Every structure is written in C-alpha cells, then in structure tokens.
Amino acid sequence: MNKPKRGVVFAALLAIVLLAGAVCALHWVNAVSLRGTANLTAYTLTDGAAQNLVPVMEDPWVDRGVLHIRGALLRLDQPVGEVKVRVGLIPERIEDGNAQQAATLLNTQMERRYELAQEYGCDDHCGFHASVAEKYLEKGNVQYCVVLVDETDGAKRMITTGMTVTLIEGGLAFVQKNAPEEEAQHAR
C-alpha cells in the first residue's frame, strides 16, 4: 500500500487552512459593510410611544476599527411579537445642522434579550447588534443620529433612539443617549 507523501498531505492541509481563512475574511467584510440607505420621506419618523414601542440603547463602542451599536426595541403592545429592525445612521453636519435625507443602514443582527423580556413583559426576540467599519463613516464634523428602521407588520417607520454618535480618529468622541430613567418612564 502506498503512503501519501508528506508534501502532498502538507499541501492539502495548507489549502484547507487558506480556504478557511478566506471564508472568515469574507464573513468579516460582510459583517462590517453598509447595507444601503433608507429614504426618510418613505418612512414615518416617530419616537415609538404611540405604537407602544420603546427603544433601549446600550453604550456603543469601537473595537479594532469597527463601530458596534447594541440595544433592543421593545414591543409593549403584545406579549408575543418578534421585532425585526435595522439600525440606521442619519448624518448631520455639526457646523450647519443640516441632516441628510437618507439613513445609512448598518448590518444588523437580531438577538434574544431575555432580561429585557422579563423586565418589561415583552417578547425576547427584541434585541439587535449592528456593526460597521469606521472607514465607511465620516469622522470629525459629522454627528450621526441613531434610528431604528422598522418594517414589522408592513409598517414603514424610523424610530428615534435619542442617541447621537460622533467619530474621531481612534474611537468615539461623543455619545449622547436617553438615561435609563427616561426609557423606563417612556415604557410606562
């Protein structure tokens, strides 16, 4: 019986490792890429209160050149009801205060949030985690208003979150968001 030569085995293993590395790199590029834009005129801009929707935002962070935004959109109108949202950023130039007419959409993954479901009595399919590479966003004189683009049940709405983000070289320069007491007050 012929034994395979070490060189052939090594080459096959190297090819598998390189292929796995390429697949991982493609997944990473996909995860931090933009997902297009949403025209503001096609959506109703709301804070969610009239629809019994409560945005809960966690502090965003930058890690290895990627901006991460995590939070949840609570549906208080029914105990069971999945939320499917995308995170959007509306750029506003700080010097003139002019906002763009479109929200830049981020890659958004939905996640379960058991602790929020128990606290507010909503479905646990309410969480999200969005990410984008910093290189796709302007830095310095642009402030981004974070919105949640919700098309659940055929509705087309952008829900304001009370959070704004400004990027500088090396991280976040400014983050403003509603205090937890305001979010809890909004939920009642």
Label each PLM-derived region with a short phrase.
Residues 6-188:
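Basic, ligand-binding patches in group-transfer machinery
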Residues 1-3:
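N-terminal secretory signal peptides that target proteins for export/translocation
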